[in-house]
């Protein structure tokens, strides 16, 4: 005979109690070389090989960068820090206001279920319309960045030139 009385009701299948997770969201530690104003080389994506200016670290652990668009065609966008090489070239970004740029600014608009169904029924290839607000923001940032870039001779040409490796180049021996 058992020392304790069996319960009147018990589940038909034993359900294991979930263990409490000890994981916590911690902010990402950026490399010491990633400081706002640093010129970066993009390694992947549509703009690979382009030199861009790093503006700000965003909450979702991405970097806010800009070409500037007028110089090399790279718009304001987010980039994962893994896909950049920091160079020793710096640009002053004191005159650039980047307060309004956050994760929500770059978030895609969510479609309702009805809109999704309609889009699936009649698929049409159309170019995405860029909001006028985005274009204005790009112009404001470009104006401030280009003013700083003009202060350094040949920096505009440096940013507009693409980076690539030639035969015999040893990337681990290069000093960026």
Curated annotation (Swiss-Prot):
PTM notes: N-terminally acetylated by acetyltransferase NatA.
Family matches, as Pfam families: Ribosomal_L6e
Gene Ontology molecular functions: RNA binding; structural constituent of ribosome
N-acetylserine modified-residue sites: 2
UniProt keyword annotations, A-Z: Acetylation, Cytoplasm, Isopeptide bond, Phosphoprotein, Ribonucleoprotein, Ribosomal protein, Ubl conjugation
Subcellular locations according to the entry: Cytoplasm
In-chain residues carrying the UniProt-annotated modification Phosphoserine: 12
Covalent crosslink: Glycyl lysine isopeptide (Lys-Gly) (interchain with G-Cter in ubiquitin): 128
Gene3D superfamilies reported in the protein's UniProt record: 2.30.30.30
Superkingdom: Eukaryota
GO cellular component, one term: cytosolic large ribosomal subunit
Gene Ontology biological process terms in this record: cytoplasmic translation; ribosomal large subunit assembly
Broad class of the protein's primary localization: cytoplasm
Coiled-coil regions listed: none
Family membership: Belongs to the eukaryotic ribosomal protein eL6 family.
Role of this protein: Component of the ribosome, a large ribonucleoprotein complex responsible for the synthesis of proteins in the cell. The small ribosomal subunit (SSU) binds messenger RNAs (mRNAs) and translates the encoded message by selecting cognate aminoacyl-transfer RNA (tRNA) molecules. The large subunit (LSU) contains the ribosomal catalytic site termed the peptidyl transferase center (PTC), which catalyzes the formation of peptide bonds, thereby polymerizing the amino acids delivered by tRNAs into a polypeptide chain.
Misc remark: Present with 37100 molecules/cell in log phase SD medium. There are 2 genes for eL6 in yeast.
Assembly, per entry: Component of the large ribosomal subunit (LSU). Mature yeast ribosomes consist of a small (40S) and a large (60S) subunit. The 40S small subunit contains 1 molecule of ribosomal RNA (18S rRNA) and 33 different proteins (encoded by 57 genes). The large 60S subunit contains 3 rRNA molecules (25S, 5.8S and 5S rRNA) and 46 different proteins (encoded by 81 genes).
Protein name (Swiss-Prot/TrEMBL): Large ribosomal subunit protein eL6A
Organism in which the protein naturally occurs: Saccharomyces cerevisiae (strain ATCC 204508 / S288c)
Lineage: Eukaryota, Fungi, Dikarya, Ascomycota, Saccharomycotina
Gene name in the database record: RPL6A
């Amino acid at each position: 005979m058992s020392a304790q009385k069996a319960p009147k009701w018990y589940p038909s299948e034993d359900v294991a109690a979930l263990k409490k997770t000890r994981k916590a969201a911690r902010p990402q530690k950026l490399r010491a070389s990633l400081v706002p104003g640093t010129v970066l080389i993009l390694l992947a994506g549509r703009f690979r090989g382009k030199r861009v200016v790093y503006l700000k670290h965003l909450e979702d652990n991405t970097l806010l960068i800009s070409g500037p668009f007028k110089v090399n065609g790279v718009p304001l966008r987010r980039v994962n820090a893994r896909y950049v090489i920091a160079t020793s070239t710096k640009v002053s970004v004191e005159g650039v206001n980047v307060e309004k740029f956050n994760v929500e600014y770059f978030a895609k608009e969510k479609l309702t279920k009805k809109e999704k169904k309609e889009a699936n029924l009649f698929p049409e290839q159309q170019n995405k319309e860029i909001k006028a607000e985005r274009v204005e923001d790009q112009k404001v940032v470009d104006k401030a960045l280009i003013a700083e870039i003009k202060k350094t001779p040949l920096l505009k040409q440096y940013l507009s030139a693409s980076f690539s490796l030639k035969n015999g180049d040893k990337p681990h021996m290069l000093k960026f």
